[in-house]
Amino acid sequence: MTLTRFVTKNAFRNKRRSLLTVLSIAFSLLLLTFMMTLWHAFSLDEGSAESAQRLVVRHRVSLTFALPGFYREKIRSIPGVVSVVPVSWFGGIYKDQKPENFFAQFGTDPDEFFKTFRDIGMPDDQIKAWQRDRQGVIVDDTLANKYGWKLGDRIMLQGTIYPVNLELNIRGIFHSSPDNKSVYFNTKYVEESVPLFKGQAGTFSILADNPGT
């Protein structure tokens, strides 16, 4: 007797029991779906409508492989692309390697960052200060509150992937929804310190003119 026939035979041996079993499982799944829907509706922040217009381009094999920098202009030439900016993971250590001191760190292009991430809020004077300072960094307000960071403070990120320690000046404190707990600095600072990585990008973030592009 095959397994399928055995299961079918026993399922129809007591039709009432089988029906109640199926109904109880279905009800449990329905209840779980309902609870997850409520939790999603009341607890999660979907972010801005503009975030739906952003795309990320990465290496097709893995995030550990960098993309050539000249891809940026190729992507920019695609119809529907409003702006494109490199975003490269740094993966440095702040203070120590304790999990509570871990946060995301990215190298990017300050001149085009806010053209792509227009839903991130930061005063214009802070944006200009960041763009002027090659060692400038902007930090999420959640991190600023956690560590007591203020404008003008200097922080150091110890390199792990890149053989360089970055000494960064806090030039801006931004707010995003939801909180992204990240910092962004000028990728040219890393390229000048480690020429081997010049002209590469971990990913490209793209802003499309509409979500359907």
Language model features: what each stretch is:
Residues R54-R58, V85, F102-G107, I138, ...:
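Soluble periplasmic/extracytoplasmic beta-strand elements of cell-envelope proteins
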Residues D111-I138, A144, K150-L157:
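Diglycine-centered glycine-rich loop/turn motifs
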Residues A52-R54, F70, K98-F103, R132-R134, ...:
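Extracytoplasmic
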Residues K9-R13, G107, W130:
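Helix-boundary and loop/linker segments of multi-pass membrane transporters
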Residues M1-L32, S43-L44:
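N-terminal Sec/SRP start-transfer signal
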Residues A66, I78, G159-T213:
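Mechanotransmission and gating elements of multispan inner-membrane complexes involved in transport
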Residues A26, L30-A104, M122, Q126-D133, ...:
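Hydrophobic, regular-secondary-structure patches
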